[in-house]
């Protein structure tokens, strides 16, 4: 995780246009010892290739691969423009984060930033902040409540089990490892019997020891019998705010519609989608998987190409990094796509729902195969 100093943050700046803003940011990077004088040319050239506007009033100007030799050390300079700077057609940036990084160092930094900035409320606060200290706290996530923890790290599938205790222990351990619960929660959820929701689904929680909101799921390879009742999957909930309620509602909808069997046969990505996305509950969803071959993964430029391809269609489209957290993201949001942390060789699953879903998936596959603007 990169560290951000208040000396690298410049609130209340004012410029006439995007080029002026980029030159000002490049000068700050040079003064801080991050880049040599020629880096500004790469920053301006990058904007000619594709806009570095992420969305939510945020831009991330940075150089091209041709000017990586101008980078002396990795760093950022943050400029806030309260009156806004036109960054492209229909794009107004209120915060520009100038990035200097050689190789693919900037990808980790970018992923950290986008996880914070993808929160719409944080982006709004960045516009109105008045001090460097306040901006730093927002960018480092210090003012952001922790998001619900429900991803590949809190799921255990295909467990050889013949009793609920095995699943209880696995879920409790996952939540403890995630820092979501304390020892009291672990003891309570292992010792107390879970609740039978029906259709092979069981649920447990604890009123004690909830440190952050999280959900753990464990599933047996084969269903087993518990006092005459079917058991195959256990959901354990740690609740520190209202975030888990949406997951429980989706779980309830699956049970009410007698579709809980989907949870018992789905792979990890589909199971996560069923619990975190309302679209996954419908029957008319198409999906396709593609492997990203771009040398540096989905950074801003290929990410923009992917999002622009998706925006050509009316269907609702989500994208899941099967080699990442496994959680689906809105395919129309560059911020959320970049935050997926896609590297070369990662598998992406796209789901599309709508009248042109089939055409959309084909176009996405063709774009990825063609290299998303960086060559196949």
From Swiss-Prot:
Phosphohistidine modifications at: 62, 299
GO biological process: phosphoenolpyruvate-dependent sugar phosphotransferase system
SUPFAM superfamilies (alphabetical): HPr-like, Phoshotransferase/anion transport protein
Gene Ontology molecular function, alphabetical: kinase activity; protein-phosphocysteine-sugar phosphotransferase activity
Residue ranges occupied by any HPr domain in the UniProt entry: 285-375
Record's GO cellular component terms: cytoplasm; plasma membrane
Annotated catalytic residues: 62, 299
Segments forming domain PTS EIIA type-2: 2-142
Domain of life per record: Bacteria
Keyword flag Protease: no
Function (record text): The phosphoenolpyruvate-dependent sugar phosphotransferase system (sugar PTS), a major carbohydrate active transport system, catalyzes the phosphorylation of incoming sugar substrates concomitantly with their translocation across the cell membrane. The enzyme II FruAB PTS system is involved in fructose transport.
Protein name, per record: Multiphosphoryl transfer protein
Name of the gene this protein is made from: fruB
């Amino acid at each position: 995780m990169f560290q951000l100093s208040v000396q690298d943050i410049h609130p209340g700046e004012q410029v006439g246009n995007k080029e002026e803003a980029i030159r000002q940011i490049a000068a700050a990077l040079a003064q801080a010892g991050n880049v040599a004088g020629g880096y500004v040319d790469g920053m301006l050239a990058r904007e000619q290739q594709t806009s570095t506007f992420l969305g939510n009033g945020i831009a991330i100007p940075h150089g091209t691969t041709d000017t990586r030799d101008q980078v002396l050390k990795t760093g950022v300079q943050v400029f806030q423009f309260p009156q806004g700077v036109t960054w492209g057609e229909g794009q107004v940036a209120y915060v520009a984060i100038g990035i200097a990084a050689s190789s693919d160092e900037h990808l980790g930094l970018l992923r950290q930033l986008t996880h914070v900035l993808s929160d719409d409320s944080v982006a709004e606060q960045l516009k109105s902040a008045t001090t460097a200290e306040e901006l730093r706290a927002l960018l480092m996530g210090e003012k952001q409540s922790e998001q619900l923890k429900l991803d590949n790290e809190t799921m255990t599938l295909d467990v050889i089990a013949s009793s609920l205790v095995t699943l209880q222990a696995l879920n409790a351990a996952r939540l403890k490892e995630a820092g979501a619960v304390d020892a009291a929660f672990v003891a309570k959820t292992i010792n107390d019997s879970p609740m039978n929701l029906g259709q092979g689904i069981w649920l447990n929680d604890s009123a004690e020891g909830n440190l952050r909101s999280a959900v753990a799921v464990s599933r047996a390879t084969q269903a087993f019998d518990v006092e005459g009742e079917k058991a195959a999957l256990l959901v354990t909930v740690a609740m520190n705010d209202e975030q888990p309620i949406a997951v429980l509602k989706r779980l309830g909808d699956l049970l009410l519609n007698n579709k809980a069997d989907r949870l018992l046969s789905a792979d990890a990505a589909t199971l996560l989608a069923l619990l975190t996305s309302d679209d996954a509950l419908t029957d008319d969803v198409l999906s396709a998987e593609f492997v990203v071959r771009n040398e540096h993964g989905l950074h801003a430029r290929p990410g923009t190409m992917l999002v622009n391809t998706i925006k050509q269609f009316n269907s609702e489209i989500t994208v899941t990094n099967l080699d990442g957290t496994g959680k689906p993201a809105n395919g129309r949001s560059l911020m959320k796509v970049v935050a997926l942390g896609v590297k070369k060789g990662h598998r992406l699953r796209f789901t599309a729902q709508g009248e042109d879903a089939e055409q959309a998936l084909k176009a996405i596959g063709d774009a990825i195969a063609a290299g998303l603007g960086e060559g196949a």
